[in-house]
Amino acid sequence: MRIAILSRNASLYSTRRLVEAAEERGHEVDVLNPLRCYMNINARESSIHKHGKELPHYDCVIPRIGASVTFYGTAVLRQFEMIGSYPLNESVAISRSRDKLRSLQLLSRKGIGLPTTGFASQPQDIPDLIDMVGGAPLVIKLLEGTQGIGVVLAETRQAAESVIEAFMGLHSNFMVQEYIKEAGGADIRCLVIGDKVIAAMKRQAKAGEFRSNLHRGGSASLVKLTPAERATAVKAAKTMGLNVAGVDILRSNHGPLVMEVNSSPGLEGIEQATEKDVASQIITFLEKNAKAHKTRTKGQG
């Protein structure tokens, strides 16, 4: 197969591993910076160009699109879908998963366990918003944040009110969530491919920190999932419409709770923690499933 990987940095661990895994199986791989791709959209024959030349046809596309370039990156991916390339994750599903509030609304509709979450825009609603999620301590998250940036633990009601007022004053979109104390600063990253969890790791926050992101100094270790955790992760990925996803779960006293569904999960932490070849399993999925115009939206966007 001819495979395109949409990535702004060919030297990133995840991108390198996907290239290695694909080439080991005899596939031809090109790493394309989505910001350097541009589109010709017309009624006769749409195309994608780079450096003044039309790109060749790719059998499938692996999107590794950063959160900061979601709009343009998904537009490029959508163009690939329109001309018949099979996307590992579809543009619609990526856009859906990048909207944290929309994701939680979709997951809640399917009855998937979540931390109680509140969303409001007016200062007069702050007291009720805090009560809605069980009072302090509580977690306040900017909707645009990634890798733990823009996530605040407010340990008292006064602190919560101050942070919420500040975010409202800055006209930032944020949500308020109950704090799951029993999780102990740990979460579980489940790597879902198709309808299976193929790898899982426990991420533990460093001392004095509640965010378990590896980018924030958290540590990763192997973890054994319960059947409920496994089923929750698969159902969450399926609800988002993602073929490959990193599903972040908290262990609570009332079962697994989904924190986030990531459409472009990093491979380094989970491959090192589990010693599993995740990249090759992604390529295997493409070999079995990649067919022209085979998308849930039939390439219609």
UniProtKB/Swiss-Prot annotation:
Domain of life: Bacteria
One GO MF term: ATP binding
Binding site for ATP: K141, E178, Y179, D187, R211, S212, N213
Record's keyword annotation contains S-adenosyl-L-methionine: no
Annotated Mn(2+) 2 binding sites: E260, N262
Cofactor note: Binds 2 magnesium or manganese ions per subunit.
Cited PROSITE patterns: ATP_GRASP (PS50975)
Family: Belongs to the RimK family.
NCBIfam families on file: PRK10446.1, rimK_fam
Entry EC number(s): 6.3.2.-
Keyword Coiled coil: no
Positions with a binding annotation for Mg(2+) 2: E260, N262
Keywords: ATP-binding, Ligase, Magnesium, Manganese, Metal-binding, Nucleotide-binding, Protein biosynthesis
Domain ATP-grasp, first and last residues per copy: 104-287
GO biological process terms held by the UniProt record: protein modification process; SOS response; translation
The protein's enzyme class: ligase
Gene: rimK
Binding positions for Mg(2+) 1 per the UniProt entry: D248, E260
Organism classification: Bacteria, Pseudomonadati, Pseudomonadota, Gammaproteobacteria, Alteromonadales
Binding positions for Mn(2+) 1 per the UniProt entry: D248, E260
InterPro entries from the UniProt entry: ATP-grasp, ATP-grasp_RimK-type, ATP_grasp_subdomain_1, RimK, Rimk_N, Rp_bS6_RimK/Lys_biosynth_LsyX
GO terms under cellular component: cytoplasm
Cofactor(s) listed in the protein's UniProt record: Mg(2+); Mn(2+)
Disulphide-bridged cysteine pairs: none
Name this protein carries in UniProt: Probable alpha-L-glutamate ligase
